[in-house]
Design a protein with these regions (language model features):
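Conserved metal-binding segment of the jelly-roll/cupin
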Residues: 103-127
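Non-catalytic, conserved peripheral segments adjacent to functional cores
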Residues: 1-106, 127, 134-174
Length: 174
């Protein structure tokens, strides 16, 4: 497993060791001990989520307030997404900065997104299935959304040959 710090050092890109042969492939998609060692702290996941989205679906930018702020380990098991992480920690030297990565079933990359970050993604393929582990349970009372096109962040979303589809909550930033 190769772990790389991105432009925002607390966000980590994880690239698994993939073993391929004529039968297909095998890789370890999650190892608690290796992840903890790579990011330098003990993380405990409490919930797994799985979503499916059609091309052009944009989800986010989502986060949860304390005491239910979530760390997330995200990956795509089918299709491809443009994944975005925004630092919303007011006391951070990287506050307001964002990083992006193409996550796909093909490249098998994952992102570790610590607490204090907003997260979203745009589906680039005909559809994509997205899996993520969270460090806190979902809490409707603490759930927040920042509009994907918020002027303070100036995120460069890719242009695609499909209409962008947003939920009402994501459109309004609720």
């Amino acid at each position: 497993m190769k772990v790389t710090s991105l432009k925002i050092p607390d966000v980590k890109l994880i690239e698994p060791d993939v073993f391929e042969d004529e039968r297909g492939f095998f890789y370890e998609s999650f190892n608690q001990q290796k992840l903890n060692e790579a990011i330098g702290k003990n993380i405990a996941f409490v919930q797994d989520n799985h979503s499916k989205s059609s091309k052009g679906v944009l989800r986010g930018l989502h986060y949860q307030d304390e005491p239910f702020a979530q760390g997330k380990l995200v990956r795509v098991i089918c299709g491809e997404v443009f994944d975005v992480v925004v630092d919303i920690r007011k006391d951070s030297t990287t506050y307001g900065q964002w990083v992006s990565e193409i996550l796909s079933a093909e490249n098998k990359k994952q992102l570790w997104i610590p607490e204090g970050f907003a997260h979203g993604y745009l589906t680039l393929s005909d559809y994509a299935e997205f899996l993520y582990k969270t460090t806190r349970h979902y809490s409707k009372q603490h759930e927040k959304t920042i509009p994907f096109n918020h002027a303070d962040f100036d995120i460069s979303w890719p242009e695609i040959d499909a209409q962008i589809t947003l939920s009402q909550k994501d459109t309004l930033g609720l």
